[in-house]
Amino acid sequence: FDYLDDKVGLYDTLRNVACGYESAASITHCWQSLNGIEKKMLNFLENHDEQRIASDFFAGDPRKGIPALIVSACMNTNPMMIYFGQEFGEPGMDSEGFSGRDGRTTIFDYWSIDSIRRWRNGGKFDGKMLNEDHKRLYEIYQRVLTLCNEELAIAKGVFFDLMYANQNGWRFNEHKQYTFMRKYKNELLFIIVNFDSQLVDVAINVPSHAFDFLQIPQMESYQAVDLLTGAKEEISLLPYKATEVSVRGYNGKILKIAF
């Protein structure tokens, strides 16, 4: 094996955060505990051993996994695994022969799953049998994974966790939101995810150490592009003034700034 599944650390933590059992601030400890071996870890949210995100045994809604997807795929340079049907919100709630109805997709029976059958559409592989929720989720997965390969700040860049500067924030809930930066040469990605169901207007503190470590200039106004939607917005990057951002429920933003 070239990579080790990050199960006990990142997977378990993201699952608990997505289900509301643990604070998003706990994600910081996951990367800290790796002690430099993060490049050898395989990040995932579903596999043959674990229950599907959309199953009744996990989150019950595939949208709740979107913030976890963004974190897992974008926080380091290591690979991210997507299990078949995950990108369509496969619930894994079939009553399969040996495994039964346990929120997993059986590895012991000859079986096919509904989301993949819909995507195959009788061998046409055009996805026309997928419903609108499936298609929207697939677009998000496709976009995030494409960014992992196209954006050098994700593929090669350095990482800076902003959570320590946002504890007990008056407009930032560290239990429901997580934020960090990725940087490569003159490109900065400001990433914020929201594990809450509601839209939030957050104010994020960027500490002086971030400017020094990432070697980024202070500016009252930057034009940033959300790489998930293509939308442009003006944000400030100053150590003495919080950066204000709105994030939809069960979603996130990957704001790109070029210097």
Could you say what each language-model-derived stretch is?
Residues 1-41, 62, 89-147, 152, ...:
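Active-site-proximal helices and loops of the catalytic beta/alpha 8
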Residues 188-195:
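Short, well-ordered beta-strand segments enriched in hydrophobic/aromatic residues
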Residues 37-60:
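Active-site clefts of carbohydrate-active enzymes
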Residues 235-259:
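C-terminal beta-strand-rich structural cap/linker in extracellular carbohydrate-active enzymes
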Residues 220-241:
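Solvent-exposed beta-strand/loop surfaces of large extracellular or lumenal domains
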